[in-house]
Amino acid sequence: MYPPGCAKVKCSWHHCLPGLLLQLLLALCFFSYLRMSQEKPKPKPMWVSELGAPSQATEGSSAHLPLRVLLWTWPFNQPVALSRCSELWPGTADCQLTVNRSEYPQADAVLVHHREVSHRPQMQLPPSPRPPGQRWVWFSMESPSNCLKLKDLDGYFNLTMSYRRDSDIFMPYGWLEPWPSQPVETLLNISAKTKLVAWVVSNWNTDSIRVQYYKLLKPHLQVDVYGRFHTPLPHALMAKQLSQYKFYLAFENSLHPDYITEKLWKNALQAWAVPVVLGPSRVNYEQFLPPKAFIHVEDFQSPKDLAQYLLALDKDYASYLNYFRWRETLRPRSFSWALMFCKACWKLQQEPRYQTVPSIASWFQ
């Protein structure tokens, strides 16, 4: 018996076959969808260089609305040229970067440089109440030894930005990236390197580890020291002057993880001098550089042993050249404030999730 108005339809197999095949196909699609939805999504890697460089090619962000990002103070109160992030960081939608504090109520995010708010944090931070959904980004390129009153900032910030690899927004002082094509830089000119070792140091603290090491080194090795308390060297002439040296003492002012500064990336590498480093461990340096791109003081039992090694390299052309082999495939790049702000812009676009950093101090120190 069938409902009124309905009649039983007889269907031979060759008439029903197309319908059965269609149902089977739909069932297969449905179960494939269920299987895919239950699988863990594979992470989509952000393009970085082989040695941890900031991204130069990122996922398209053109669909994102431009964010208004307020720079609360200039770093060290020194204005810098701001760039269009879509040009400086390909794949990033342009943020409305501003230093006009009157736009604070409308800003999607506020970038706060530590140095300018470290003396009286509660009075120098942006005012309360904070606009709903606004994110604050704490940033600093100084080491913990030079960041005061970090505990006073606990609970205020949503993101961190620094040279530390575990920052929410990682911005190293420098990085290596593959050549976009064949290397275009001229070959190393050994004949121009008529001097042995240079060191530029502005803050001369006699109790610091780097000065103590230098005092043990200098009886065994001639080191030309430049800086405020030694031979003056204008910044505009630094690269030209340092390019005359085979080695450069890239000694950091304090020893902290990932704290590898312009002393290596600019002073040494831009001058084609082999960096002799004193800072974090060799293992830490090798997370940024190939093992044969630098000489670490911890590889030697004493400053005297280091001096003897450098003097031997000075006379061994082939061994000295081995410290430049990495340049055949990689080139050094350097940090800039404009690039840092655009990295923040990119991160804020990619990560809309709201979070709070409970304690800057416990993380950074």
From Swiss-Prot:
Gene Ontology terms for molecular function: 3-galactosyl-N-acetylglucosaminide 4-alpha-L-fucosyltransferase activity; 4-galactosyl-N-acetylglucosaminide 3-alpha-L-fucosyltransferase activity; alpha-(1->3)-fucosyltransferase activity
Subcellular location: Golgi apparatus, Golgi stack membrane
Presence of the UniProt keyword Membrane in the record: yes
Catalytic activity: a beta-D-galactosyl-(1->3)-N-acetyl-beta-D-glucosaminyl derivative + GDP-beta-L-fucose = a beta-D-galactosyl-(1->3)-[alpha-L-fucosyl-(1->4)]-N-acetyl-beta-D-glucosaminyl derivative + GDP + H(+); an N-acetyl-alpha-neuraminyl-(2->3)-beta-D-galactosyl-(1->4)-N-acetyl-beta-D-glucosaminyl derivative + GDP-beta-L-fucose = an alpha-Neu5Ac-(2->3)-beta-D-Gal-(1->4)-[alpha-L-Fuc-(1->3)]-beta-D-GlcNAc derivative + GDP + H(+); a beta-D-galactosyl-(1->4)-N-acetyl-beta-D-glucosaminyl derivative + GDP-beta-L-fucose = a beta-D-galactosyl-(1->4)-[alpha-L-fucosyl-(1->3)]-N-acetyl-beta-D-glucosaminyl derivative + GDP + H(+); an alpha-Neu5Ac-(2->3)-beta-D-Gal-(1->4)-beta-D-GlcNAc-(1->3)-beta-D-Gal-(1->4)-[alpha-L-Fuc-(1->3)]-beta-D-GlcNAc derivative + GDP-beta-L-fucose = an alpha-Neu5Ac-(2->3)-beta-D-Gal-(1->4)-[alpha-L-Fuc-(1->3)]-beta-D-GlcNAc-(1->3)-beta-D-Gal-(1->4)-[alpha-L-Fuc-(1->3)]-beta-D-GlcNAc derivative + GDP + H(+)
Keyword Glycoprotein: yes
Biological pathway: Protein modification; protein glycosylation
Superkingdom: Eukaryota
Secretion signal span: none
Its EC number(s): 2.4.1.65, 2.4.1.152, 2.4.1.-
Protein name per UniProt: 3-galactosyl-N-acetylglucosaminide 4-alpha-L-fucosyltransferase FUT3
